[in-house]
Amino acid sequence: MNKTQVPSLITSQSWYVIDAKNQKLGRMSTHISNILRGKNKPSYTPYLDTGDYVIVINSSEVSVSGNKTTQKLYRRHSGQPGGLKVETFEQLQTRLPNRIVEKSVKGMLPKGPLGRKLFTKLKVYPGPSHPHAAQKPQEYMV
């Protein structure tokens, strides 16, 4: 069977920086997942990793609309009987601000081996600095 897309012709992967300060979580996560998948490129192929790397800074200052700061719940389970832990958006943002953006983007990626590979290309930092200056990332406006 002949393929119309030749995998060796895929362009190189670039790096983008997204500032999460005062950005809505869902809208920003949609842009991030599209970049990770490679849907912003003409060489997009659903079964290949054609996406770019994304660095998110200021993840501790991401916002949500409405009453989600007090009403949105994040659940995790330890595996033990009675081991369900529940946290609100506000509590999780003070404890682990990176986890909010990571969980939001991970839910928008494909489930399976390709999605796990794409998720490793997301780098999230709570402050304004990141250690990826050597990659010369481009500013991406959401």
UniProtKB/Swiss-Prot annotation:
Pfam families reported for this sequence = Ribosomal_L13 (PF00572)
Question: What are its GO cellular component terms?
Answer: chloroplast; cytosolic large ribosomal subunit
Record GO terms (molecular function)? mRNA binding; structural constituent of ribosome
Concerning PROSITE patterns, the annotation shows:
RIBOSOMAL_L13
Q: InterPro entries of this UniProt entry?
A: Ribosomal_uL13, Ribosomal_uL13_bac-type, Ribosomal_uL13_CS, Ribosomal_uL13_sf
GO biological process: one example: translation
The subcellular location is: Plastid, Chloroplast
Keyword set, alphabetical order? Chloroplast, Plastid, Ribonucleoprotein, Ribosomal protein
Q: What NCBIfam families does this protein's entry cite? A: rplM_bact (TIGR01066)
The entry describes its oligomerization and partners as: Part of the 50S ribosomal subunit.
Family to which this protein belongs? Belongs to the universal ribosomal protein uL13 family.
State what protein this is by name. Large ribosomal subunit protein uL13c
Taxonomy of the source species:
Eukaryota, Rhodophyta, Bangiophyceae, Bangiales, Bangiaceae
Task: Give the gene symbol.
Answer: rpl13
